[in-house]
C-alpha cells in the first residue's frame, strides 16, 4: 500500500527553527479504529482478534517534503503510526554538483569512502536532528546496525525508548511506540533511500 497525500505541508512551509515540540501525549485518534482488522487467533481456534494494519506508505523525492510529512503526522496526532519513504540526493551531493544532477560524479556512491563519510556526517549532524525537531519528541537511536552487500549499504536505526515522556503518561493514553529508520546507499548512484516507520508497540 503506498500513496501520496495532500497534507498541511502543502500550505505550511517547513521551518525547522520554529516547530513546537510535543509537550504532552493525547488519546489515540478515533480514526485509528478504521485501521483495525480482524484475523484468526492462533491462541483460540475459531476465534478472532483485532489487529492494527500497517500504516499506508507515503513516498517522497525531496527531503523537505519528507520532513514536513513527519511534522504533519505529529500535528495530526499520528506520531506513533506512519510510514514514509524518501528517495533523494543528500544536500552534500547537490552542493558538490551545484544542483546540476547530470554533473554528479559517477564515483559518488557507497563504494567511495568520501561519499560514505559525508553521508554519515549528514545523517548524524543533520538528518536525525532535523527529524527529531519534526517529530516533536526525543529520538534515541542506538548505534546503527550496518548491513552491506555488493550493491548496497544500509544503516538500520531503532528507538524503542519512552521518547522523553513518562511511563505514566504513555500508559495513561496507551501510547507506546517504536521508530525504525533505515538509510540505504547504493553502488551505482548517489541517490539515498530513507525508510522511516513509527509503529505502536503492543497492538
Swiss-Prot record:
Membrane topology: Peripheral membrane protein
Entry's localization field: Cell membrane
Signal peptide: none
InterPro entries: RGI1, RGI1_sf
GO terms, biological process: energy reserve metabolic process
Cellular compartments per GO CC: plasma membrane
Domain of life from the UniProt record: Eukaryota
Record key words, sorted: Cell membrane, Membrane
Main location: membrane
Family under the similarity heading: Belongs to the RGI1 family.
Function description: Involved in the control of energetic metabolism and significantly contribute to cell fitness, especially under respiratory growth conditions.
Protein name, per record: Respiratory growth induced protein 1
Name of the gene encoding the protein in the UniProt record: RGI1
Amino acid at each position: 500500500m503506498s500513496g501520496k497525500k495532500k497534507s498541511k505541508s502543502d500550505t505550511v512551509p517547513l521551518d525547522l527553527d520554529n516547530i513546537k515540540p510535543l509537550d504532552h501525549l493525547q488519546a489515540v485518534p478515533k480514526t485509528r479504529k478504521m485501521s483495525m482488522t480482524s484475523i484468526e487467533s492462533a491462541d483460540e481456534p475459531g476465534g478472532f482478534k483485532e489487529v492494527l494494519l500497517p500504516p499506508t506508505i507515503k513516498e517522497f523525492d525531496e527531503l523537505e517534503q519528507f520532513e514536513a510529512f513527519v511534522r504533519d503526522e505529529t500535528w495530526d496526532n499520528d506520531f506513533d503510526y506512519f510510514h514514509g519513504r524518501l528517495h533523494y540526493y543528500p544536500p552534500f551531493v547537490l552542493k558538490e554538483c551545484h544542483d546540476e544532477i547530470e554533473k554528479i560524479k559517477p564515483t559518488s556512491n557507497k563504494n567511495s569512502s568520501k561519499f560514505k563519510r559525508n553521508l554519515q556526517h549528514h545523517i548524524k549532524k543533520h538528518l536525525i536532528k532535523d527529524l527529531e525537531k519534526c517529530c516533536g519528541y526525543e529520538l534515541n537511536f542506538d548505534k546503527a546496525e550496518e548491513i552491506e552487500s555488493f550493491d548496497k549499504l544500509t544503516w538500520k536505526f531503532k528507538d524503542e525508548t519512552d521518547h522523553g515522556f513518562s511511563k505514566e503518561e504513555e500508559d495513561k493514553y496507551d501510547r507506546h511506540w517504536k521508530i525504525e529508520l533505515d538509510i540505504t546507499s547504493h553502488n551505482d548512484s548517489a541517490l539515498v533511500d530513507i525508510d522511516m516507520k513509527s509503529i505502536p508497540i503492543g497492538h
